[in-house]
């Protein structure tokens, strides 16, 4: 028959709780008197609650600078920031060193030494390499064969002999009918129409291939007399015409292209304003033959050019 006195064994859960309490007691006993990893278990006076924040500190030891700052986070807790810098000494020119000692002004008046990101932009360093003339000659680039073709005249207009296509000639509507009418009057064939009388043939300057010195008496044209000494210089006045009602934008080249189909031109004089350099509205054209000048008067007088009607007549001979 069971009695009230019996040995009750502790349960497994009770044994676990007792072992945990014993472990906590042992751990707390072992940690007493053992310093932390920092060497000091107490808070610094600057980090105590209620103490004011000290100013930043800078300690320079050789080429190592240590900056210590104290701040307060969002939760109101104080914390310390320690930054370590390595000081490097760089050599600079006198002008750069002098500029660094200038007093700051404006928004950077109270900034510490050094650039401020808000007001200063530090660009990348640009390295320059200086070479001598000998190295420059050795590094010359190869000549482009296309550059040689730039100076050559590949396309030639049949009307004004310009460097453009005939269909795009700006004088197609003015000089074209005049050349056609002149060719019909002279009775030229189709092949000869391209070379009307008076057109200037391209003259290429003869170059001395040997490179030797040639005296003036043996050069080309040495046997010819000067223009002022020619006896037929007076005849130019008889083959000179006067053109009026020209626009202000007219140039000698325009007159050359306009009157060249009628014959060989000896000289052109365009009256210009000394201040503006624009045309005064009249010009003198001298031909080598009087017949060419007569054809020019008949062909151009009353002709519309640059929105104006040209008036061409014989020029009065000079009294000199």
Curated annotation (Swiss-Prot):
<feature type="modified residue" description="Phosphothreonine">
    <location>
        <position position="41"/>
    </location>
</feature>
<dbReference type="GO" id="GO:0003723">
    <property type="term" value="F:RNA binding"/>
</dbReference>
<feature type="domain" description="RRM">
    <location>
        <begin position="239"/>
        <end position="317"/>
    </location>
</feature>
<comment type="function">
    <text>RNA-binding component of the eukaryotic translation initiation factor 3 (eIF-3) complex, which is required for several steps in the initiation of protein synthesis. The eIF-3 complex associates with the 40S ribosome and facilitates the recruitment of eIF-1, eIF-1A, eIF-2:GTP:methionyl-tRNAi and eIF-5 to form the 43S pre-initiation complex (43S PIC). The eIF-3 complex stimulates mRNA recruitment to the 43S PIC and scanning of the mRNA for AUG recognition.</text>
</comment>
<keyword id="KW-0396">Initiation factor</keyword>
<feature type="region of interest" description="Disordered">
    <location>
        <begin position="209"/>
        <end position="234"/>
    </location>
</feature>
<feature type="modified residue" description="Phosphoserine">
    <location>
        <position position="189"/>
    </location>
</feature>
<feature type="compositionally biased region" description="Basic and acidic residues">
    <location>
        <begin position="221"/>
        <end position="234"/>
    </location>
</feature>
<keyword id="KW-0694">RNA-binding</keyword>
<dbReference type="GO" id="GO:0005852">
    <property type="term" value="C:eukaryotic translation initiation factor 3 complex"/>
</dbReference>
<keyword id="KW-0539">Nucleus</keyword>
<keyword id="KW-0963">Cytoplasm</keyword>
<protein>
    <recommendedName>
        <fullName>Eukaryotic translation initiation factor 3 subunit G</fullName>
    </recommendedName>
</protein>
<dbReference type="InterPro" id="IPR034240">
    <property type="entry name" value="eIF3G_RRM"/>
</dbReference>
<dbReference type="GO" id="GO:0048471">
    <property type="term" value="C:perinuclear region of cytoplasm"/>
</dbReference>
<feature type="modified residue" description="Phosphothreonine">
    <location>
        <position position="38"/>
    </location>
</feature>
<feature type="modified residue" description="Phosphoserine">
    <location>
        <position position="264"/>
    </location>
</feature>
<dbReference type="GO" id="GO:0033290">
    <property type="term" value="C:eukaryotic 48S preinitiation complex"/>
</dbReference>
<feature type="region of interest" description="Disordered">
    <location>
        <begin position="1"/>
        <end position="25"/>
    </location>
</feature>
<keyword id="KW-0597">Phosphoprotein</keyword>
<dbReference type="InterPro" id="IPR024675">
    <property type="entry name" value="eIF3g_N"/>
</dbReference>
<keyword id="KW-0648">Protein biosynthesis</keyword>
<dbReference type="GO" id="GO:0006413">
    <property type="term" value="P:translational initiation"/>
</dbReference>
<feature type="modified residue" description="Phosphoserine">
    <location>
        <position position="11"/>
    </location>
</feature>
<feature type="modified residue" description="Phosphoserine">
    <location>
        <position position="42"/>
    </location>
</feature>
<dbReference type="Pfam" id="PF12353">
    <property type="entry name" value="eIF3g"/>
</dbReference>
<dbReference type="GO" id="GO:0003743">
    <property type="term" value="F:translation initiation factor activity"/>
</dbReference>
<dbReference type="GO" id="GO:0016282">
    <property type="term" value="C:eukaryotic 43S preinitiation complex"/>
</dbReference>
<feature type="modified residue" description="Phosphoserine">
    <location>
        <position position="8"/>
    </location>
</feature>
<dbReference type="Pfam" id="PF00076">
    <property type="entry name" value="RRM_1"/>
</dbReference>
<comment type="subunit">
    <text>Component of the eukaryotic translation initiation factor 3 (eIF-3) complex, which is composed of 13 subunits: EIF3A, EIF3B, EIF3C, EIF3D, EIF3E, EIF3F, EIF3G, EIF3H, EIF3I, EIF3J, EIF3K, EIF3L and EIF3M. The eIF-3 complex appears to include 3 stable modules: module A is composed of EIF3A, EIF3B, EIF3G and EIF3I; module B is composed of EIF3F, EIF3H, and EIF3M; and module C is composed of EIF3C, EIF3D, EIF3E, EIF3K and EIF3L. EIF3C of module C binds EIF3B of module A and EIF3H of module B, thereby linking the three modules. EIF3J is a labile subunit that binds to the eIF-3 complex via EIF3B.</text>
</comment>
<dbReference type="InterPro" id="IPR017334">
    <property type="entry name" value="eIF3_g"/>
</dbReference>
<comment type="similarity">
    <text>Belongs to the eIF-3 subunit G family.</text>
</comment>
<feature type="modified residue" description="Phosphoserine">
    <location>
        <position position="223"/>
    </location>
</feature>
<dbReference type="GO" id="GO:0001732">
    <property type="term" value="P:formation of cytoplasmic translation initiation complex"/>
</dbReference>
<dbReference type="InterPro" id="IPR012677">
    <property type="entry name" value="Nucleotide-bd_a/b_plait_sf"/>
</dbReference>
<dbReference type="GO" id="GO:0005634">
    <property type="term" value="C:nucleus"/>
</dbReference>
<dbReference type="InterPro" id="IPR035979">
    <property type="entry name" value="RBD_domain_sf"/>
</dbReference>
<dbReference type="InterPro" id="IPR000504">
    <property type="entry name" value="RRM_dom"/>
</dbReference>
